C-alpha cells in the first residue's frame, strides 16, 4: 500500500512539475516600464511589446509599421549583373503603404493624425467610407463637440443635434455643407456636359479637396500631394443625400459618378506595386478593410499588415477577421508580417504614429536641417 501511495504521489508530482522546454533566447521576457527611471514617452511606448496582452500586440504593430517605413528594395537579394545605377535606384524603392479607416475616426480627433500623414506624404493610398470624406470637409466649416454616450436620442433630435458615440454634431453643420458642396456639383455637372469629364469617386474627392483649400483637411493634403483617396460607397452618407437633392433639382441627365474606373485604379495600385512591397494599416473594419485587402489579393497578398479594431471573428464578419484569415484568401502574403490590435483606434493609432511615422519625420527633418 505504501509503495502504491508513493507511486501515486510521484506521478502527481511529475504531472504538476512537468519539465519545461526552454524559452531562453526565443521569446521576449515580460516586463513593463519602470517609472523610477523618469518619464520617457518613447521608452514607455517601446516597452509595450514586452508588457503583454494587447500592449504587446500594439508593440508588435509599431515594429511592423517601422519595418514598412524602413524597407527598401536594396534590402532584398540583388540580381546578378546589377549595375551601380540599378543598385542606387533600388535604394529609392520604398514600401507602398495603404491606410484605411472608418468614418467615425474622421469624426474623432484621429482626423488630425491622418491629416499629418497626408501632409507629409507618409502614406500612398487612402480608403475610407463616405462619412470619412464628408466629415473632413464639414469640420472645415463647423465644429464637432464632445458629449456623452448616454445622451437621450429623442432629446437630441428635438434640439437638432446628432450623436456619434460621445460626439455631438449640430445638424446646422450639414446645412453649411450643402451650401458649400452644391455649387461645386453644379460646376462638375457643367464640366461633365461640356468637356465630357468622367467623374469617379476618387476624382470627385480630389476636386473637393482642392475646393476646400484648408490645411486642416486631410483631403486637401491628399489632393495637394497626389495621394489617391478611394471611397466605393460614396453615396452612403450626406454626400449621397446631396447628390440626390442635386440630381432631382436638375432636369435631364444628372451628375454621373463611375465607380468601375475606381476599382480598376485601386486594384492597379496593388497590381503594379511590384517591385515594391506593400503594407496595409487598417483602422476599424467594414468596407475600407475589405477593399484594401481585396486589392492586395491581386498581388498574392500584402507583405506587412496592421489591423486595429474591436470587432470579433465569431460571427464570421470580415471586420472581426484576424490577419490569418486574410492569409487564407491571399490578401496577406503567407510570408508576410501581420498583427491585429484589439483596441479602440482612437487610443492605439496616435500612439502607434508617435513611435513610427512621427519619429521618422523628426529624424528626417534633423538630417535635412529643417
UniProtKB/Swiss-Prot annotation:
Catalytic activity field: putrescine + spermidine = sym-homospermidine + propane-1,3-diamine
Tissue: Expressed in roots.
Biological or metabolic pathway of the protein: Alkaloid biosynthesis; pyrrolizidine alkaloid biosynthesis
Superkingdom of origin organism: Eukaryota
A Gene Ontology molecular function term of the record: deoxyhypusine synthase activity
InterPro entries given in the database record: Deoxyhypusine_synthase, Deoxyhypusine_synthase_sf, DHS-like_NAD/FAD-binding_dom
Pfam families linked: DS (PF01916)
UniProt keyword NAD present: yes
Cofactor(s) annotated in UniProt: NAD(+)
Main enzyme class: transferase
Post-translational changes noted in the entry: The N-terminus is blocked.
Keyword terms, alphabetized: NAD, Transferase
Record Gene3D superfamilies: Deoxyhypusine synthase
EC number: 2.5.1.45
A GO CC term attached to the entry: cytoplasm
Cited PANTHER family: DEOXYHYPUSINE SYNTHASE (PTHR11703:SF0)
Quaternary structure (record): Homotetramer.
Function per UniProt: Catalyzes the transfer of an aminobutyl unit from spermidine onto putrescine. The resulting polyamine homospermidine is a precursor in the biosynthesis of pyrrolizidine alkaloids.
Similarity comment text for this entry: Belongs to the deoxyhypusine synthase family.
Protein name stated in the entry: Homospermidine synthase 2
Lineage start: Eukaryota, Viridiplantae, Streptophyta, Embryophyta, Tracheophyta
